[in-house]
């Protein structure tokens, strides 16, 4: 709710699409309780993962928007920082912006997932980005038109980044003061990172075949 409240009055934003992926946290009800004509809620009957939700929201957004962004729902009040990501696109400085977060407050993983993502993108494109795993991104519509659909799984961001750079679009990382729930060093955190690692490896293997 805080995320929606903090972006609904940003003048550059015409529509906010919320995808309720059949989760148990009452996403639809929360979204509908926010007073704004900009909010459009899409409800899925069952949870089919992040990639599926992104594709659903994207289909809707592509109908009328020139600039499209992805934001996680847990950014809270810091979501208003999205303005910093929108401005370079409007000013035609680049085709895609990626949010670069301040250093994490709590000790997360051992950085191996981040490094794998960073090195994979660099190896395939020659471009070094530090926030390859950040899902907070703004795109010009023509960038998203190169995708039939967004790749599924935790490798989403890495796969997209490789394709975007290979198609000669320009990506700019923008430092933002956003915060969201971080993955800690507990078992759940390690399982999450293990899955990420596996998915990134899989996506990169796939991209190497595609871009031979």
Language-model features and meaning:
Residues 1, 25-29, 52, 131:
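Residue-level preference for short helical/loop micro-motifs built around acidic side chains
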Residues 1-9:
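Short, well-formed alpha-helical segments that are part of the catalytic scaffolds
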Residues 14-15, 67, 170:
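Residues at the starts of beta-strands that form the adenosine-phosphate
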Residues 14-17, 28-60:
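Conserved donor nucleotide-binding strand/loop of the catalytic core
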Residues 20-29, 75:
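A conserved acidic beta->alpha catalytic loop
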Residues 46-60, 67, 79-154, 181-191:
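Acceptor/aglycone-binding surface of glycosyltransferases and processive sugar-polymer synthases
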Residues 65-76:
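Short beta-strand-to-loop acidic/aromatic patch adjacent to the donor-nucleotide binding site
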Residues 150-212:
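Hydrophobic helical membrane-anchoring modules
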């Amino acid at each position: 709710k805080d995320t929606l409240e903090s972006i609904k009055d940003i003048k550059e934003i015409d529509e906010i699409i919320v995808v309720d992926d059949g989760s148990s946290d009452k996403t639809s009800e929360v979204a509908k309780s926010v007073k704004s004509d900009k909010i459009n809620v899409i409800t899925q009957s069952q949870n089919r993962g992040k990639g599926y939700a992104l594709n659903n929201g994207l289909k809707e957004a592509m109908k009328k928007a020139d600039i499209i962004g992805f934001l996680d729902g847990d950014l809270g009040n810091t979501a208003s920082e999205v303005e910093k990501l929108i401005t370079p696109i409007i000013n035609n400085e680049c085709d895609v912006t990626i949010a670069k977060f301040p250093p994490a407050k709590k000790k997360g993983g051992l950085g191996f997932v981040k490094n794998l993502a960073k090195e994979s993108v660099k190896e395939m494109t020659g471009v070094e980005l530090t926030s390859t795993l950040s899902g907070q991104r703004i795109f010009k519509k023509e960038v998203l038109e190169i995708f039939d659909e967004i790749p599924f799984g935790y490798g989403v961001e890495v796969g997209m980044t490789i394709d975007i750079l290979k198609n000669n679009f320009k990506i700019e990382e923008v430092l933002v003061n956003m915060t969201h729930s971080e993955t800690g060093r507990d078992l759940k955190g390690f399982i999450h990172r293990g899955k990420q690692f596996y998915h990134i490896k899989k996506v990169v293997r796939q991209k190497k075949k595609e871009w031979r």
